[in-house]
Amino acid sequence: MVSILDQPVANLAAKIRSGELLAMTLVSESLNRIRFHNGSLNCFTRVLESEALSAAAEIDRQVARGINPGLLAGVPFACKDLFDVKGLSTTAGAKNRIGSEPAAHDAEVVQKLKNEGAILMGTLNMDEYAYGFVTINAHFGATRNPHDTERLAGGSSGGSASAVSAGLVPFSIGSDTNGSVRVPAGLCGIFGIRPAENAIPMQGVFPLVKNLDTVGPFARSTDDLELVYRVLSHPSSLKTTNTSNVRKDLPIRVARLGGWFERNATDEVLDAVLTLMARLDAKAVVEIPEAEAARSASIIMTAAQGGALHLDLLSKDPMSYDPAVRDRLLAGTMVPFSLYSQAVQFREYFRKQVAKLFESFDILIAPCTPCVAPLVEDPTVWIDVKKTLARASLGIFTQPLSIAGIPILSVPWIREPANSTQLPIGIQIATWPGREDLLFTFAKRLEQDGLIGSCCPIQYDH
């Protein structure tokens, strides 16, 4: 049986604005699904039941009085426990932040969604301090993949991806520093976006790497994702892309990223990308020779800024941290400033190299992750013929593109049932800043042609 939550976000909001559907009905359905499924998935760190019901009642009162509640009227959502929610402690997934001073205001992005009538259902699990790709949390536990609960949801926004994939909420928000939206979106078989730098406000979001951090939404269709993205974006990002960027009268020029972006991909992941290119009749393959160095630069910047941010508390109470995160932060405190400076300088050089590619191509395509979701009990991946920890290595294809500062969609490949384990495979679709309209238009075309699309895991389709 299909849940009412599975309808497009715009349709749900329109029905609530017209009075055809009550916000209370929608929120109650979300709460029921959270109660039924969160125990097996561990998406939520807090469920704000009374607050959500009160907000739904207010939306219904506004509609009864003829007031338009907004573009997202009555639609439930949830946010990564990295975003300030007024009256709550922002834990950032950390035990040592439980009981910290409650936020005086909502994060700007949370407030933007509420201003358009969306209803916050709760906060979502994550890797501690957003430092990892697995959402295995020493205090809050592991978030599990709805397609196979023995497997990872990915991270660090794993709760955000799992909750949407299982249909607990129609959309959610997370953060992406080095791939923390794209990795879990890919592993959970839904849509996500890492926006261009400064496209979405970061006020009220706990930082990891200030010059790499971004906020990105998750959804189960390109239409839903674009709608939420438009609400979250700064006004300057809402403008229609100009004609020269869209190139409306010309074919979209597509290239696949080779080299680093195929070297460690499993056969099934690489086959998905190659099949997509073949279906598009796109043959161009380009390499970014400095991609591996770009990944190293992102690692250095993350370690150095993370270590500096946490130095005081690490000195006073190191045992209060998740051991896996503590070790990485401590290593970051020892990164020489000269090495950090080189990484920052390299970032500017790398961006110029990527910009040159977009002189010849409109869209670049690459895998999201090197493999499908690893097991929770064996969170490892094979990199250069070595078994390595997924916590640090699931983002080998997302980290270099993060450094470039470009907008990137994570889209779920539709697999052939006869040849697959049915675990999702995510594909990155990237463009240059200012071409976001083209990015969404291209993704919608793929979705309409049946090449990409999210599919609710069968056990949650009720």
Predicted regions and their residues:
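Short, well-ordered beta-strand elements within core beta-sheets of diverse protein domains
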Residues: 11-18, 97-101, 213-220, 329-335, ...
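Structural helix-boundary/capping segments
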Residues: 36, 115, 165-260, 274, ...
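Immediate post-signal peptide segment of exported/extracytoplasmic ligand-binding proteins
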Residues: 59-76, 246-255
